[in-house]
């Protein structure tokens, strides 16, 4: 009888310590980041110089901004994008960690020409999505937009920053 009481007390203590442990672990919630228009970007066909799209854009220039990109956002309107600006032209590779919606990732060289496009990058995918040539600028837009616009390697961008 005493053994059963002791066993019951031990089981009760284990259950209580386990339940206390669970309640002390807090889930960290991240607040969704909202879009802030910081400039405008125009995509043009290289062969005709015709405008295929005009976008409101956010810039990613700091290390934090380039590491975070469009993470923790639920969606983005089709006329928006994020332009990553790097100090030099180099091989680039992006991934979709913590990115909740599919993207087209468009790589540009220092002459503002498309060098490659990674289409329909899957949400939360940690696979490497490299440029096919050195890039200085990278534009992230909603998946499928590059096909809708009919852009390809050699097409160009122009962009401007809002005056502060």
Pin down the residues of each PLM region:
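N-terminal secretory signal peptides that target proteins for export/translocation
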Residues: 1-2
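C-terminal motif of bacterial Sec signal peptides marking the signal peptidase cleavage site
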Residues: 15-19
């Amino acid at each position: 009888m005493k053994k059963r009481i002791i066993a019951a007390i031990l089981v009760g203590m284990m259950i209580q310590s386990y339940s206390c442990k669970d309640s002390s672990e807090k889930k960290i919630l991240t607040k969704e980041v909202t879009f802030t228009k910081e400039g405008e970007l125009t995509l043009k066909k290289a062969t005709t110089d015709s405008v295929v799209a005009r976008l409101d854009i956010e810039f990613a220039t700091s290390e934090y901004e380039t590491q975070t990109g469009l993470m923790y956002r639920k969606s983005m309107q089709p006329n928006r994008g994020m332009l990553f600006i790097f100090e030099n032209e180099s091989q680039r590779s992006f991934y979709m960690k913590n990115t909740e919606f599919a993207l087209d990732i468009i790589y540009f060289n220092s002459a503002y020409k498309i060098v490659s496009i990674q289409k329909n990058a899957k949400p939360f995918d940690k696979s490497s999505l490299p440029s096919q040539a050195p890039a200085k600028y990278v534009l992230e837009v909603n998946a499928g937009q590059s096909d809708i616009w009919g852009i390809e390697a050699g097409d160009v961008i122009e962009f401007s920053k809002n005056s502060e």
